[in-house]
């Protein structure tokens, strides 16, 4: 299944994302785990599709992302890749699959063969040698810093990161180490907006925020969160884009527009130090 796209639409590459960042054009990113939503996101102009290990929560009903396996990620990547025509496709390396550089490379090869254009991994400056190892072997990397859900038990829960001077300094080191190792995107989750803005200015590569303020180069949300599939309490950084819309397509287009014009995230969706 796919949608008939405008033939003038160009494939989104890492080079194009860098050009968007340099020009100050915001990048819209959303999750997808199946071909139907992948096709719709691509049709609506989402530049980056993330096959996140959040599928453990969204698709499997897990409380954390820890039970997700490499086989799960490869399967859902294949589903998304079949329908995606122009978006850059990023897939998470799941918990326990990148403990060493060699393990990370073997896992990344599996995901790239399934259709990913880039892999995402969670960690700080200690992970720089692994990122460098992957990049040297032609595996593009998105580095995920700040709140890293695979470390939920080590953190003692889902908590905003970088609120103290020491924590903020560590996140700056993490971001710089990831860029120096060759990461071509740095994703920041649950980071005070001012700090995320400072890091964005400090780096030359694009930054993507989720609960990290409006000054990042782009934004990402879990699709099912932003179309309000699940009733009840949402994370602070989530906005219900179904408000005022009658279709999911309308909600996705509203999200893309809000990211592009800078109206999302608003102050109510961000954290302070």
Curated annotation (Swiss-Prot):
Database matches in CDD domains: KPHMT-like
Record: residues binding Mg(2+): 53, 92, 122
GO cellular component: cytoplasm
Cofactor entry: Mg(2+)
GO molecular function terms attached to this record: 3-methyl-2-oxobutanoate hydroxymethyltransferase activity; magnesium ion binding
Catalysed conversion reaction: 3-methyl-2-oxobutanoate + (6R)-5,10-methylene-5,6,7,8-tetrahydrofolate + H2O = 2-dehydropantoate + (6S)-5,6,7,8-tetrahydrofolate
EC code: 2.1.2.11
Positions that bind 3-methyl-2-oxobutanoate: 53-54, 92, 120
GO BP: pantothenate biosynthetic process
UniProt-annotated location(s): Cytoplasm
Pathway assigned in UniProt: Cofactor biosynthesis; (R)-pantothenate biosynthesis; (R)-pantoate from 3-methyl-2-oxobutanoate: step 1/2
UniProt remark on cofactor binding: Binds 1 Mg(2+) ion per subunit.
Binding partners and assembly: Homodecamer; pentamer of dimers.
Role summary: Catalyzes the reversible reaction in which hydroxymethyl group from 5,10-methylenetetrahydrofolate is transferred onto alpha-ketoisovalerate to form ketopantoate.
Matching PANTHER family: 3-METHYL-2-OXOBUTANOATE HYDROXYMETHYLTRANSFERASE
Protein name: 3-methyl-2-oxobutanoate hydroxymethyltransferase
Organism: Cupriavidus pinatubonensis (strain JMP 134 / LMG 1197)
Gene name in the database record: panB
